[in-house]
């Protein structure tokens, strides 16, 4: 906080321009042009009239009572704000300097190799994080003159139907399903409703999810999902045959467009020599196709449950590339 007559303000501005990547300066309407004059002094600039505001000529982005200026290492947003009045738009946002993308069905080494040359071309840096096998999260940061948007567009061309630009994959799935008038439902055993929770913790879930079923016991798999008793007896609840019928059953019950089923042994007990703890089967079904995966996960109960839910999400996205990519 500075007063208008504070002589240290010029020194403060110069220090901040040299050390800060991002800076927001809030001033009263009375001092708005004074601050602009000080900034112009520090940056060897002059003030000009833009949109009925006297602001530094180097401010290339501006709206009423707010402007953005880039100088040295710093992006500075100056805002004129008075009590009892609506706050002006903040122009300094993270979207310009940071973004997240998700890449599917690609290993980390290959993704790094593909993205490295693009990163140099578009002046961005990135970090690849493995969520699960076949699902990578890429955190992108812009350098001073970088262009994240062009980087992502170029990456999409190299990775057709493999890249989704979003920081929150569940929110993205909900929006896509809603836009396409599609519904989803889950039949969960070892995850105990975790997959449902991942979706219902986001706004808009009720538009695409009418309900789901948690069926721990064989009786409920039989009675609620119409899993055949003979199949349960012959193959056991943790089997590809059972998750196939579970996904079919939950679609029949809910009339959803996508049915996801999970059955496994999360631990810490319950495993056998043939089916040790961490054995999980996941099924994903649409009205026209069905996919399954058999996992051998290593970790505690929570880890097995979380990994199982993440694999189901990945399978949902990749089973219908027509709408998700």
Locations of regions flagged by a protein language model:
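Short alpha-helical segments enriched in small residues
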Residues: 1-93, 110-119, 147-325
């Amino acid at each position: 906080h500075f007063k208008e007559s504070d002589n240290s303000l010029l020194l403060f501005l110069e220090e901040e321009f040299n050390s800060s990547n991002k800076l927001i300066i809030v001033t009263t309407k009375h001092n708005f042009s004074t601050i602009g004059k000080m900034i112009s002094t520090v940056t060897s600039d002059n003030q000009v009239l833009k949109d009925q505001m006297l602001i530094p000529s180097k401010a290339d982005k501006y709206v009423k009572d707010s402007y953005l200026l880039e100088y040295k290492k710093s992006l500075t947003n100056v805002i004129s704000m008075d009590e009892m009045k609506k706050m002006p738009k903040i122009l300094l946002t993270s979207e310009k300097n940071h973004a997240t993308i998700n890449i599917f069905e690609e290993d980390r080494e290959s993704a790094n190799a593909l993205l490295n040359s693009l990163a140099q071309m578009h002046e961005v840096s990135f970090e690849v994080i493995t969520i699960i096998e076949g699902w990578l999260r890429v955190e992108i940061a812009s350098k001073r003159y970088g262009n994240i948007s062009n980087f992502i567009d170029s990456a999409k061309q190299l990775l057709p139907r493999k890249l989704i630009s979003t920081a929150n994959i569940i929110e993205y799935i909900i929006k896509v399903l809603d836009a396409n008038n599609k519904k989803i439902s889950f039949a969960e055993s070892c995850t105990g409703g975790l997959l449902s929770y991942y979706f219902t913790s986001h706004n808009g879930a009720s538009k695409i999810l009418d309900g789901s079923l948690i069926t721990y016991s064989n009786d409920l798999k039989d009675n609620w999902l119409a899993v055949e008793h003979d199949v349960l007896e012959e193959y056991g609840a943790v089997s590809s045959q059972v998750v196939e019928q579970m996904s079919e059953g939950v679609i029949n019950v809910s009339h959803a467009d996508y049915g996801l089923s999970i059955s496994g042994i999360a631990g810490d007990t319950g495993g056998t020599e043939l089916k040790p703890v961490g054995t999980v089967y996941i099924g994903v079904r649409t009205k026209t196709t069905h996919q399954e995966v058999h996992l051998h996960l290593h970790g505690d109960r929570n880890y097995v449950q979380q990994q199982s839910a993440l694999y189901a999400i990945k399978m949902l996205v990749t089973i219908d590339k027509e709408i998700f990519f």
